[in-house]
């Protein structure tokens, strides 16, 4: 056995790393499932509860509102009280709220419960990515963090399968569909029990003995934590907008929003869009393109390993924008439309791996959860607003203008990435989060 001193950042991948990754991915599987099943449940909920279009939209978007709140609040709390407590609490909340959906009797009940589910998921996004980043070795950190997109997509596709199965002639099937999310959530809650605290966070709090005890227990007595600097001050959300960090905050928030808006808009309304752009069998196109999301996410893992993160993101923004512009210029039903939609689906799924990597690597330990939480919150706010506006935009201006607007959003993401994106690939976590270091690419404006 090798007993020479080695930094935690330089360790080979081991079973403990895989365990933390699997427990983190459980949140993304559940998130994809929760956001996917609601579209099918609303088919039955609309006549059963006599939903108005506004109330149906509120139920559909309530989990995104919760994600916004949970990402901000629980991310900030975890920087103060630790990662492990929120890592466990978030899924207790998700499990309970998911189960209680079975007994909902009014639209307001469902909205409240799905906001609670979203709060749990939002907090878990902030803390899960942070905890995984703080344990992962630098050579494997990108793949581990980026793999969440694959798992999220699997959850989303499983929701489609469950939706087709549950939504039948039984008018109460929606209860079983929504409550079914409690099963994976309960399993994840039980498996997370006993997860250790982040030693990097403990070291930042001056709790040296606890930090080194965790490192020695899970990695060995020869493993060193690295170059974390102890800080006595507590950080607040205004720290993200200080002269030191505002570019990192702006980049991570804007690039996340600019990827999520076209993703959620197109895939929330995929059957409608498929018909509008002239795809003959909307259901077949929807199922095929959902399957392509998994292919794209797997391709993204390979590209994340091969390419610099910054170049991968810049190239993807340009390709996605160009694809939508060409689609907007084609006549409805053009033979090229499906091919371009396949290219768009694969590319956006592939590059979405970076939303799990870049925010977690862009901030130092004492504000990492806060930074990840803020970027996630902004992405969910953008998704909720844009998804809600899509029917109105389609009715007012049509599909051509809608696609051009989405292309504009992607070009904004390109510009912000070019101006402020750091290159964090394969760096020690301390160096990746070091503003002003050799990895900086900020352009003064």
From Swiss-Prot:
Regions crossing the membrane: 23-43, 57-77, 86-106, 115-135, 143-163, 176-196, 254-274, 287-307, 312-332, 338-358, 370-390, 401-421
Keyword Endoplasmic reticulum: no
A Pfam family it matches: Sugar_tr
Membrane-side (Periplasmic) residue stretches: 44-56, 107-114, 164-175, 275-286, 333-337, 391-400
Its membrane topology: Multi-pass membrane protein
SUPFAM superfamilies per record: MFS general substrate transporter
Domain of life, source organism: Bacteria
CDD domains: MFS_SV2_like
Record topology, Cytoplasmic segments: 1-22, 78-85, 136-142, 197-253, 308-311, 359-369, 422-445
InterPro entries, per the entry: MFS_dom, MFS_sugar_transport-like, MFS_trans_sf, Sugar_transporter_CS
Keywords: Cell inner membrane, Cell membrane, Membrane, Transmembrane, Transmembrane helix, Transport
GO molecular function: transmembrane transporter activity
One cellular-component annotation, GO: plasma membrane
Protein localization: Cell inner membrane
Recorded family membership: Belongs to the major facilitator superfamily. Sugar transporter (TC 2.A.1.1) family.
Protein name listed in UniProt: Inner membrane metabolite transport protein YgcS
Species lineage: Bacteria, Pseudomonadati, Pseudomonadota, Gammaproteobacteria, Enterobacterales
